[in-house]
Swiss-Prot record:
Protein name, as recorded: tRNA U34 carboxymethyltransferase
Task performed by this protein: Catalyzes carboxymethyl transfer from carboxy-S-adenosyl-L-methionine (Cx-SAM) to 5-hydroxyuridine (ho5U) to form 5-carboxymethoxyuridine (cmo5U) at position 34 in tRNAs.
Gene expressing this chain: cmoB
Organismal lineage: Bacteria, Pseudomonadati, Pseudomonadota, Gammaproteobacteria, Pseudomonadales
Quaternary organization: Homotetramer.
UniProt keyword tRNA processing, yes or no: yes
Database matches in Pfam families: Methyltransf_9
Amino acid sequence: MIDLAPLARRLAGTPLADWANGLQAQLDTKMAKGHGDLQRWQSALDALPDLQPERIDLLDSFTLQAECNGETRTVLRKALLGLSPWRKGPFNVFGVHIDTEWRSDWKWSRVSPHLDLKGKRVLDVGCGNGYYQWRMLGAGADSVIGVDPNWLFFCQFQAMQRYLPDLPAWHLPFALEDLPANLEGFDTVFSMGVLYHRKSPIDHLLALKDCLVKGGELVMETLVVPGDVHQVLVPEDRYAQMRNVWFLPSVPALELWMRRAGFTDVRCVDVSHTTIEEQRSTEWMRFQSLSDYLDPADHSKTVEGLPAPMRAVIVGRKP
């Protein structure tokens, strides 16, 4: 059982206290419904060897170090491979390098210089396996809660938390819609790689704003296209082989959406093209990846003939 009592204690006396006190029952209900692969993933978690990190780096990477013999490292590697595919990372865990599909550390190096997370209560929406949550703690956040309904990501987070049990990071297997309206308790809210999956992007922005305290900051990272304030791409069917992609705005259009949703001080801090070095298949994620989704003759286009993935980071403040 996942014990959320430390989370409730952490949030006592904050605007999130009432919500936190009800989370254990909400999580237990969700866990009772389960998932067909949960037992297999739990077996992988149970196989993780008992190790105590002697050195922890979350600021410049995710690295845990300790004395670890070859036999123990082999057991560790096998257990972690049992939680494949690994999408976000990389993680270096006692000498086992989890070479994830995404070089999420590259994205973090583009995002983090523009933020001040020291002492902040942070919510990461669509947090994946929690890689960024650990890096947010490394950047000085007071506490980080991630929500993502994917059970494998939940288990991957538990694997890392096994070795960092006292750090104030929690992964809840919930969707944003499972959170109560008007939480208004987080200093910083992240939504990275989520907006284009939403049929109603404005509603998503409004829901994110509801989670923020007054003066809180939204960090929005999403796929964008070139163009002016009127340019928005709606794929006819798939985009880069993904069916669930709805709206890809230009940067000026996204900035307008955020202002219409009530954010102020809206500004774009980064735009970058996703490369096949940043997103690729590895031993830890053996399925298709970006190179399979691009036009083999022209990497500026997807296989559908649409503009290749370009991602922007926009920040804004709740007045």
